UniProtKB/Swiss-Prot annotation:
<dbReference type="Pfam" id="PF00561">
    <property type="entry name" value="Abhydrolase_1"/>
</dbReference>
<comment type="similarity">
    <text>Belongs to the AB hydrolase superfamily. Carboxylesterase BioH family.</text>
</comment>
<feature type="binding site">
    <location>
        <position position="21"/>
    </location>
    <ligand>
        <name>substrate</name>
    </ligand>
</feature>
<dbReference type="GO" id="GO:0090499">
    <property type="term" value="F:pimelyl-[acyl-carrier protein] methyl ester esterase activity"/>
</dbReference>
<keyword id="KW-0378">Hydrolase</keyword>
<comment type="pathway">
    <text>Cofactor biosynthesis; biotin biosynthesis.</text>
</comment>
<feature type="domain" description="AB hydrolase-1">
    <location>
        <begin position="15"/>
        <end position="239"/>
    </location>
</feature>
<keyword id="KW-0963">Cytoplasm</keyword>
<dbReference type="InterPro" id="IPR010076">
    <property type="entry name" value="BioH"/>
</dbReference>
<dbReference type="InterPro" id="IPR050266">
    <property type="entry name" value="AB_hydrolase_sf"/>
</dbReference>
<dbReference type="GO" id="GO:0016020">
    <property type="term" value="C:membrane"/>
</dbReference>
<dbReference type="InterPro" id="IPR000073">
    <property type="entry name" value="AB_hydrolase_1"/>
</dbReference>
<dbReference type="GO" id="GO:0009102">
    <property type="term" value="P:biotin biosynthetic process"/>
</dbReference>
<feature type="binding site">
    <location>
        <position position="235"/>
    </location>
    <ligand>
        <name>substrate</name>
    </ligand>
</feature>
<feature type="active site">
    <location>
        <position position="235"/>
    </location>
</feature>
<feature type="active site" description="Nucleophile">
    <location>
        <position position="81"/>
    </location>
</feature>
<comment type="subunit">
    <text>Monomer.</text>
</comment>
Amino acid sequence: MASIHIETTGNGPDLVMLHGWAMHSGVWDGVVESLSQRFRLHQVDLPGHGASRDCALDSLDQMTEVIADRLPGRYSVCGWSLGGQVAIRLALQAPERVQQLVLVASTPCFVRRADWPWGMEDSTLTLFMENLARDYTQTLNRFLTLQVSGSEDQARVLAWLRKSILRGQPPTPATLQAGLKILQTSDLRAELNQVSQPVLLIHGRNDVITPAGAADWMQQHLPRARLVLFPHCGHAPFLSFPEQFVSCFDAL
């Protein structure tokens, strides 16, 4: 198996940065300069993404295990969306290594269920999987549009996301379909109360991919959680409000 790509910059306590589905570690570029003045950042390309493109993406547990082998002995972790689920898994699998979590626009369960109203329709994710094989570019564009929905600066953030994807070699359709399958099937709700570390939840109030109700639920069920809600913000608060996003790390 090819190795995971990690870019390390800055000085200070170790902070691991995990991006979301279909993206790569460069998505954090707008906040790296500020954060690297306070932390030693480890920007990870998830399996099948970015410079880790040749590393197979199989499951949430596989992602966690492959990444954990490359991380410092002790670290905090910031995960966006799918990266947030990887962060939760890291904290559960090796609590002695993970000091704190920052979960950005994340959720324990991406799909709406009878007892979980704060998710996407299962049929929507299935349609994304089917359409990736038919029209890769258009399907990615549709997902990026969902990410910026609800933001007051949708055009700017959408342009930035599109530019960010083009900066690296995009994931294969098979990788993206495998990632969507993880989003469709993973449900960490029953395990969430076992996360003993302090958790900072950063969420956009208008997020349509991981609705803010999911963040409220996590705050209630995580033993040591604090929630920061960004108004007029969708699924990418670190792109819509980079300065405010960085200021949230003052509490770490």
